[in-house]
Swiss-Prot record:
Its main location: membrane. GO terms for molecular function: protoheme IX farnesyltransferase activity. Gene3D superfamilies: UbiA prenyltransferase. Pathway: Porphyrin-containing compound metabolism; heme O biosynthesis; heme O from protoheme: step 1/1. Carbon 2 of the heme B porphyrin ring is defined according to the Fischer nomenclature. InterPro entries: Protohaem_IX_farnesylTrfase, UbiA_prenyltransferase, UbiA_sf. This is Protoheme IX farnesyltransferase. It catalyses: heme b + (2E,6E)-farnesyl diphosphate + H2O = Fe(II)-heme o + diphosphate. It is found in: Cell inner membrane. Keywords: Cell inner membrane, Cell membrane, Heme biosynthesis, Membrane, Transferase, Transmembrane, Transmembrane helix.
Amino acid sequence: MALIIRSEIDKATQAITTALPWRDYYELTKPKVVMLMLLTSLIGMLLATPSPAPLWLLVLGNLGIGLCAGAAAAVNHLVDRHVDVKMARTFHRPVANGRITPTNALLFSALLGGVGLWILSSFINALTAWLTLASLLGYAVIYTLFLKRATPQNIVIGGLAGAAPPLLGWTAVTGELDGHGLLLVLIIFAWTPPHFWALALYRKKEYAKAGIPMLPVTHGDSYTRLHIVLYTVILIAVTLLPFATRMMGYCYLVGALVLGAGFLYRALKLLVSKDPKQGLETFKFSIIYLMALFVVMLVDHYLFPIPVYGV
């Protein structure tokens, strides 16, 4: 029955995408992931200065960053096509499914990346363009080609590339590196392991079938649950740094502590739970947590500004 349903889904998908091939290329960019990255990039832009940056800079900066993120996602589709066909979550992807050829995926990625870097270097600044290129290569090459299949710490090491967008947004506005911008990167860097390991617990069998050495596959569920708790504690500590450095005020401190307590509760619940769906619930909550934390940052930054900006 499952095979029949899967066959019918494939037929329906093929019929739709044959009529609307642009949808396949849109899917190639992982739009949901890119949108999350652009939200964090926008947060970086809005936090970089006491008053909002010009609209044209926000639009062009995020356009360039978004195109480069889409380029990296397309490379991920290309490299992972043999793995994607083994996983229920990804077997329908356009390259894995054969709807887009590897050559066309590579050309599409090169086009997006080239245009994105041109926008950043021509209209924003060279620093942002170079940092975006480094992030693109870090995700598409270092993580996707090597780390993902090499070590269960793939998410920890490779998470730095995915944590870069707020810094890219920050440098797009200021044109220079800043410790506060790096703090935003550190927050996402600490958030990434518990976020993805929670999903890996739920998708453990699929990762094992595909040969991806995610932590639950190599070290077991109990070990992974414990590390989710430990990294959540680290995350909470990291989120206090913006207050400690006077980047943020008391409004942020209260919000960060409340949200952190909620995340820790979820992590502890996952630690003792035997329900496999609890991993998925923790994964979903982690996304809400990150967005809520950044909203609190914006509220604190604009409604309760500290007297002396910076350190």
